[in-house]
Amino acid sequence: MDFNLNDEQELFVAGIRELMASENWEAYFAECDRDSVYPERFVKALADMGIDSLLIPEEHGGLEAGFVTVAAVWMELGRLGAPTYVLYQLPGGFNTFLREGTQEQIDKIMAFRGTGKQMWNSAITEPGAGSDVGSLKTTYTRKNGKVYLNGSKCFITSSAYTPYIVVMARDGASPDKPVYTEWFVDMSKAGIKVNKLEKLGLRMDSCCEITFDDVELDEKDMFGREGNGFNRVKEEFDHERFLVALTNYGTAMCAFEDAARYANQRVQFGEAIGRFQLIQEKFAHMAIKLNSMKNMLLEAAWKADNGTITSGDAAMCKYFCANAAFEVVDTAMQVLGGVGIAGNHRITRFWRDLRVDRVSGGSDEMQILTLGRAVLKQYR
């Protein structure tokens, strides 16, 4: 088994290091986090490197580099302090439209390639339908040759500034036998109200409540096939959970290295605190968790590239990495002491971000349920 990166992957990682060393990005990230602003200038710099084309097929002008390459890039970005959670739509967002969208929809989304701007996101969660997706109440109703969308969504990522949202709704004409379909919605349409929510972490990406009051659509705005909404988003959930896990690992690695540098230079009782056995124990446990996360993620990326990744794999990565990474960051904060809880150290941002990730993108509890079912299914 060869864990070395290939030449193309090494070039991407080297490019990431060069970009992150080109200026004081941390000051920019801190400002964006404080003001809850999407770091568009940073994402544009990544797009200029071709990061938003990593998974796009070659026939569409992409690199088709694969998930192991995505993993290598995400891990390095995270290790160097970048908020990779704002990039979730970059690796697969274009491919989703190339696979499911009409030509008109594809053209609208592909126009954002290389810009660094937010382009679209899914709107599924509702006040009464979180993990219980089958309880969705938002409806679409056909009338006089048009389609009307009514209902409300909540905790919808990126929706304060994305020009398009793909909304999951149920057929209002079929109350007894629910039919779930997605619709491609231009956020400038009449009847849409957006309320931005404050969050503990992940502040560089918006989170909103959205209401739809007789929002008028056309049949051509259907996204994918009618009644195929759940099947389509299942794949998106797995993709998102893998990316969340990559983000968690990278962030934890950054916190670990910050704490290690501090432990080797912080002197108490006449010597660096890194020489104290209690501190060494903390680093041993952090290193075990980081190594376990990395190996799990690389295996999942390899499976994704070979078409064998399952929902159980994605759930395992999401659950383990969200929890292990938070534990690493929390321990690193303990090593930093007062420096980590007062002032402007970036570990406070990491701590807030990773606590949110145990809920965002699928709660811990739902990952356990998904994984448990997948494990037992193998032995039936």
UniProtKB/Swiss-Prot annotation:
Keyword Cytoplasm appears in the UniProt entry: yes
Pfam families, per database record: Acyl-CoA_dh_1, Acyl-CoA_dh_M, Acyl-CoA_dh_N
Any one biological process term the GO annotation gives: carnitine metabolic process
Pathway the protein acts in: Amine and polyamine metabolism; carnitine metabolism
Cofactor requirements of the protein: FAD
Coarse class of the protein's main subcellular location: cytoplasm
One GO cellular component term: cytoplasm
Superkingdom of source: Bacteria
Keywords of this entry: Cytoplasm, FAD, Flavoprotein, Oxidoreductase
Subcellular compartments: Cytoplasm
GO molecular function: acyl-CoA dehydrogenase activity; flavin adenine dinucleotide binding
EC primary class: oxidoreductase
Catalytic activity: 4-(trimethylamino)butanoyl-CoA + oxidized [electron-transfer flavoprotein] + H(+) = crotonobetainyl-CoA + reduced [electron-transfer flavoprotein]
Record EC number: 1.3.8.13
PANTHER family noted in UniProt: ACYL-COA DEHYDROGENASE, ISOVALERYL-COA DEHYDROGENASE, MITOCHONDRIAL-RELATED
Subunit record text: Homotetramer.
Reported function: Catalyzes the reduction of crotonobetainyl-CoA to gamma-butyrobetainyl-CoA.
Family: Belongs to the acyl-CoA dehydrogenase family.
Stated name of the protein: Crotonobetainyl-CoA reductase
Source organism per UniProt: Salmonella typhimurium (strain LT2 / SGSC1412 / ATCC 700720)
Upper taxonomic lineage: Bacteria, Pseudomonadati, Pseudomonadota, Gammaproteobacteria, Enterobacterales
Gene: caiA
